[in-house]
Amino acid sequence: MSILTRWLLIPPVNARLIGRYRDYRRHGASAFSATLGCFWMILAWIFIPLEHPRWQRIRAEHKNLYPHINASRPRPLDPVRYLIQTCWLLIGTSRKETPKPRRRAFSGLQNIRGRYHQWMNELPERVSHKTQHLDEKKELGHLSAGARRLILGIIVTFSLILALICVTQPFNPLAQFIFLMLLWGVALIVRRMPGRFSALMLIVLSLTVSCRYIWWRYTSTLNWDDPVSLVCGLILLFAETYAWIVLVLGYFQVVWPLNRQPVPLPKDMSLWPSVDIFVPTYNEDLNVVKNIIYASLGIDWPKDKLNIWILDDGGREEFRQFAQNVGVKYIARTTHEHAKAGNINNALKYAKGEFVSIFDCDHVPTRSFLQMTMGWFLKEKQLAMMQTPHHFFSPDPFERNLGRFRKTPNEGTLFYGLVQDGNDMWDATFFCGSCAVIRRKPLDEIGGIAVETVTEDAHTSLRLHRRGYTSAYMRIPQAAGLATESLSAHIGQRIRWARGMVQIFRLDNPLTGKGLKFAQRLCYVNAMFHFLSGIPRLIFLTAPLAFLLLHAYIIYAPALMIALFVLPHMIHASLTNSKIQGKYRHSFWSEIYETVLAWYIAPPTLVALINPHKGKFNVTAKGGLVEEEYVDWVISRPYIFLVLLNLVGVAVGIWRYFYGPPTEMLTVVVSMVWVFYNLIVLGGAVAVSVESKQVRRSHRVEMTMPAAIAREDGHLFSCTVQDFSDGGLGIKINGQAQILEGQKVNLLLKRGQQEYVFPTQVARVMGNEVGLKLMPLTTQQHIDFVQCTFARADTWALWQDSYPEDKPLESLLDILKLGFRGYRHLAEFAPSSVKGIFRVLTSLVSWVVSFIPRRPERSETAQPSDQALAQQ
């Protein structure tokens, strides 16, 4: 190139061009790409006045306007990317930067829109104000109870007839489209309304569309003339029926969360009952157990009415010695039947308190735990059990491996944030094995903790409900623990839960037997059905292959009718769940969670349905390390198999599209879209199986807390604790912190009105941020540190409120990125024999994605004007 440019260009220009070529090469561009980049630059200088101030401004904003194009490392087709992105910018900015006269022309519409939103926000309060007199006045109060029941029965019967007509009425495509547009319009209007009314309306609309869909599937979409199509269609219909049942039961379960608040205790402490705290342990490390014991010693409860027990099923001498040193009671069994349930039942023989509180050995209670929960027991004498959330201060495998800790609600947030609150409305709260209080009298009546299944907690609450006792749930986190450290451990835990719930379904079916209310039966059945999702999920992941590979019509209907029934069913369900579950489960994430577990929970649940006594109990390991990033090939093997199977479907689908009958082209397209969606979800499952590093033995907890540090010369610095762990803290100094580097300082923390001092060493200094390492502590200092940090009453209360609201489209984009990330990991960690295949595929997808236009990043100077415009 140098010879040609030296001949064509003057020396100064040639020198600059050679310098640019070398710069391209230095940033990793190939010789061909660098040469072509220089050629494009010459053409740009010839035809575009790049020296003009306007073009100079565009070049200065290159990183914001063209975020996906690296100007220092050109690629051969960058001009095409520039062209597509420029067109996108012109179209996008033309909508946003509307001239002022035009804005005024549409100001009337903007005012109407603003008034509409204001009216929708004020509507619930207006309705409440207009109808508050009805709370005191009963319109049918003058009638007898029998007459009121008759009127209610007539209304319900009439409503059911209307619903049946609405669901079963056949429509032609145009009528179906108009009907769906009406429902969709109502949904878009209602979803913006705050309060429970909008959620109830969305549930009604979703059920209407979904019931029409399932009716249509049963009556119009099975091919009875082709055995292969019939069998495949029935298999898919089975999975869809399961999903529809779970959808309906799920709506019922969370239709009106109770959101129970604490009841104050009597001022006379002599009326407070005695409580035994049980901490069962088997093979956990003593360092894991210490924190819960130290925190329990500081619980705000009369010391003469509080007994703490270590239930050691491992019979370890170091645990016995530790219990003796800190002044708690210790029990070790000589036999170990029935695992955790047997361990607790053995301790019940020795404990004599009126109530028993159970904690897994990694759950650390706050000091307010008993004061927040015990008031309800004194108010309601039939209350047998109070459950609080299982909160985790360490990331679970999904959060850690995907880098989503405290950015996206984790897998358990939906259950403890919404489902249990919904169960509480129907008096169907489940005992979850930890972070709960149980009244001894009902527990003794049912013979202690249930031992017939491996999920002894849920079975115990079922037995209490059968006896006529009530349960309660308080959504305020009052304890926190360690999440599972690896995906394999997480899956093992879920396998045990799935097998146990199916065992209960077989051995003590909530649909049969005495003692349960109808609503309780439905809530228990839905919980058990949830763990039967393995087989239906696998069916959904392979269903489109039936047509592509076997030419089986699993939905025997025109593609237009499939779109008119399937898409509204999915969209309404997604919209409704986004409204109800927004803070607790973001859209499309259930697909990832269920896909990861599907292959592994399907066999044990099927075995438990056939033989409920088969299987064994396994203990979930906590507190482990992951020293190097790696792909868990054993866990990911099923996902990779499904990926390869779907890729075969893609290849066959492409062949069918070009060489198959023209009448099937639209059906092939629909099937291919389904396959690509499955590939995205499977890619997400693969991404989860890449274990990220976890080299900290002590997990850091983010928290803002005032504190102070004192140097050895007595000089004090006020500071704010930003995070803490069992081994140190991160603080922010009000001022320069460089003078503290390497020094030994005392950390001052407050608990109530009392101040505690802890010796620390400054481990790092970055600006005004300081990392402190705890020096060796005495037992009493360790107790005080745990009670000043982990056991503070307000430590976990606001964590659930930190999650952003669900935005379905953004969530879908996250899932797309997650799926692509999974395939990149396969290319990175795959064996050398197949690494080339994955690398080619991911490179091809990355190359295609590189042409997609991006939304430009906003500059700092543009933000105030945009905000001002929004306020105007």
Regions found by a protein language model. Name each.
Residues 274-276, 307, 459:
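Cell-envelope/extracellular polymer assembly enzymes that use nucleotide-activated donors
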